[in-house]
């Protein structure tokens, strides 16, 4: 007979028609949570029938339509989140949801891909000229590379895409295209409870001129061991994130999950993104990584139980 589960965990997701085949982690994560005597449930964040109070932990997994309705998502998060039960913490998610967090990490000494945030078409054109000859245009709030393109700096599409983004009520981010991404891709280092779990190499996604390599959004993922300088920058970025969490949000507990995306340049590695909200972990490329994640969730449940017992005493 099975013992009582350590706890019930909601893996926060969205509808299948949004996810498609892009969610590659959740099956293995669910299996390892069950193996750790945890009861997982996939829960769509905008499903009004879900009883969020029935869960011990709410773990953000893949609510990938949030960027189309960010205000609605944040209002939902604020309504259901209870202290210690929503992971990663809502304050961190709110900060990380907008990619302008990169500028704060830069100010803390983390080398980032040069980034300009634009609020008008004129600012976009000036930033494109400065960042060229080849640039990446994206919204500051986005998921799955939506409304993101690699373009020549003088391509008329730069302005038309920027106007669409601005019309959606978002700011525009302009970055130079990093040549090594087209050949070597990016390095993504995944941390669970602040400890490096594994790293993968992500192949190029964007095609010059707009659109995706191969005509559709796909990620070519392979296991990798980063060079020392890349690994050191990932750790530096994590240290800066911990500093932000402590100073701004009084959060001193390690984040349950984080993914640090890095690129290599002639001037050394640079931070491209720090994914603290809804990243893929690519557990299929790293045997044992889903089990490590499940162990971290089990520790959170145990800590939550201790806090509850102390409160009730």
Regions found by a protein language model. Name each.
Residues 135, 190, 197-198, 258, ...:
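Protein kinase-like catalytic core scaffold
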Residues 16, 91-93, 119-124, 140-144, ...:
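Short acidic/polar capping segments at secondary-structure boundaries
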Residues 109-136:
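Rossmann-like NAD(P)H-binding beta-loop-alpha module
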Residues 152-247, 263:
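Phosphate-binding site of ATP-dependent enzymes
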Residues 229-313:
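ATP-dependent carboxylate activation and anion-phosphoryl transfer catalytic cores
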Residues 55-60, 188-191, 268-279:
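A short beta-strand motif that forms the metal-chelation/ATP-contact edge
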Residues 6-8, 15-114, 119:
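Conserved N-proximal alpha/beta basic substrate-recognition cap immediately N-terminal to
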Residues 105-106, 128-148, 170-183, 200, ...:
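ATP-grasp fold ATP-binding core
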